[in-house]
From Swiss-Prot:
GO annotation, biological process: defense response to bacterium; defense response to fungus; killing of cells of another organism
Protein name, entry field: Neutrophil defensin 2
Family: Belongs to the alpha-defensin family.
Biological classification of the source: Eukaryota, Metazoa, Chordata, Craniata, Vertebrata
Organism expressing this protein natively: Macaca mulatta (Rhesus macaque)
Disulfide bonds: C2-C30, C4-C19, C9-C29
Coiled-coil portions: none
Length: 30
């Protein structure tokens, strides 16, 4: 599963880009 996170991905996840949600930029993590 993939998630949008602030401020960064959790350990063991990879960042594949960004999400724009509620006026903020989130890390897109899988």
């Amino acid at each position: 599963a993939c998630y949008c996170r602030i401020p960064a991905c959790l350990a063991g996840e990879r960042r594949y880009g960004t999400c724009f949600y509620m006026g903020r930029v989130w890390a897109f993590c899988c």
